[in-house]
């Protein structure tokens, strides 16, 4: 097993505001391996942005330990314990290897695209001509070479975010933190930015920490996911595990935003076929991972049990090269045979949720 590039252990972040104490992050531990695109999902106030700001100590934790690239940035075993912290100058150097992009692009309005990207190189040891070449290379990477001398006011939201990405990459970081970077963008532009992030990960091995409230964004680029609520991680796993077998209600809610299966169920419930189920008919959801509900299995229900499957809706996602999907079906046949068919589906690792009928 490879050593994590980011290791957060027992992180607590507590804020004291007048007479209030706010526990923004509560005893969170997380390991992110080199080359991961790690999605951290949660609604506003869940603590996800506070947590990732701990990585480069923009937010110092109240307690816990922060290790990046095998180097301890911070350690305090409890709130009252003596703190060990990396020196200010050393931290400044290490931060150059951790790029960040945000929902608001934080560009300098009075500077051109080229000058905005070059700003990140002001403390670089590169010579002027090397800096110029570096900026040109970055603008080509984010497909903005033709906008080099324009100002932020002349750019679209997506173009501004591309400038921010180029600037974040200027010092050749090993880690890129994306904090709600697509939240202010339209769906088409969001997909373009996500595609760029995926390219950076795949072609350059960039480790990306993706903070978002949009499960669709996670689905597009992440290989691992953690779900946060009230300062805690309530569920984590590979993208495939989270989508195929969500354990928490909040996780299921997020997945619904990326699949719309619940919306399909509510719509189909009102169809005459479902409203007027006959004896021996069941309206059910079949959930599966892999090739377990390919056409021969569905067809075998009729061949082996004389049970027909009327498919009303299907949704299939390919996650980490594995099909994950749901079918909404009406199963019809003799009640005992329908039950036998359901058992057969279960034996083939198909999760069956009966939505109506079968009493």
From Swiss-Prot:
Look up the domain of life of the source: Bacteria
Domain ABC transporter: where?
8-255
InterPro entries, A to Z: AAA+_ATPase, ABC_transporter-like_ATP-bd, ABC_transporter-like_CS, ACT-like_dom_sf, MetN_ABC, MetN_ABC_transporter-like, NIL_domain, P-loop_NTPase
The way this protein sits in the membrane is described as: Peripheral membrane protein
Q: Which residues bind ATP?
A: 42-49
Q: Top enzyme class of this protein?
A: translocase
Q: What is its EC number?
A: 7.4.2.11
Q: What does the record give under GO molecular function? A: ABC-type D-methionine transporter activity; ATP binding; ATP hydrolysis activity
- Give me the disulphide-bonded residues: none
Catalytic activity field: L-methionine(out) + ATP + H2O = L-methionine(in) + ADP + phosphate + H(+); D-methionine(out) + ATP + H2O = D-methionine(in) + ADP + phosphate + H(+)
**Pfam families, A to Z:** ABC_tran (PF00005), NIL (PF09383)
Instruction: Work out whether the entry's keyword set contains Membrane.
Output: yes
Mind telling me which GO cellular component terms the entry cites?
Answer: plasma membrane
The record's keywords, sorted A to Z, are:
Amino-acid transport, ATP-binding, Cell membrane, Membrane, Nucleotide-binding, Translocase, Transport
Functional note:
Part of the ABC transporter complex MetNIQ involved in methionine import. Responsible for energy coupling to the transport system.
Assembly information from the UniProt record = The complex is composed of two ATP-binding proteins (MetN), two transmembrane proteins (MetI) and a solute-binding protein (MetQ).
Q: What is this protein called?
A: Methionine import ATP-binding protein MetN
Q: Which gene encodes it?
A: metN
């Amino acid at each position: 097993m490879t050593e994590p590039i980011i290791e957060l252990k027992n992180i607590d972040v507590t804020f004291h505001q007048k007479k209030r104490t706010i526990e923004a992050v509560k005893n969170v531990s997380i390991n992110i391996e080199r080359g991961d695109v790690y999605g951290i999902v949660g609604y506003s106030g869940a603590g996800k942005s506070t947590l990732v700001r701990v990585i480069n100590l923009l937010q110092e934790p109240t307690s816990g330990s922060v290790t990046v690239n095998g180097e301890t940035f911070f350690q305090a075993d409890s709130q009252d314990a003596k703190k060990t912290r990396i020196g200010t100058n050393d931290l400044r150097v290490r931060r150059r290897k951790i790029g960040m992009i945000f929902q608001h692009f934080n560009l300098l309005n009075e500077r051109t695209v080229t000058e905005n990207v070059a700003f990140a190189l002001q403390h670089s040891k590169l010579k002027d001509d090397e800096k110029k070449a570096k900026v040109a290379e970055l603008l080509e990477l984010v497909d903005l070479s033709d906008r080099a001398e324009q100002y932020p006011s002349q750019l679209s939201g997506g173009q501004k975010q591309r400038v921010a990405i180029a600037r974040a990459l200027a010092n050749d970081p090993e880690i890129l933190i994306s904090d709600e970077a697509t939240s202010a963008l339209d769906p088409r532009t969001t997909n373009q930015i996500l595609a760029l992030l995926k390219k950076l990960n795949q072609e350059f091995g960039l480790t990306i920490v993706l903070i978002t409230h949009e499960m669709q964004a996670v689905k597009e680029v992440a290989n691992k996911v953690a779900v946060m609520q009230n300062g805690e991680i309530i569920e984590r796993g590979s993208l495939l595990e989270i989508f195929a077998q969500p354990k928490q209600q909040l996780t299921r809610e997020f997945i619904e935003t990326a699949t719309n299966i619940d919306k399909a169920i509510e719509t189909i419930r009102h169809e005459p076929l479902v409203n007027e189920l006959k004896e021996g008919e069941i309206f059910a959801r079949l959930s599966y991972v892999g090739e377990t509900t390919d056409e021969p299995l569905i067809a075998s229900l009729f061949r082996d049990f004389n049970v027909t499957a009327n498919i009303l809706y299907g949704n299939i996602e390919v996650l980490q090269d594995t099909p994950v999907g749901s079918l909404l079906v009406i199963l019809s046949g003799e009640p005992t045979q329908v039950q036998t068919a359901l058992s057969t589906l279960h034996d083939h690792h198909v999760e069956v949720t009966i939505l109506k009928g079968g009493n």
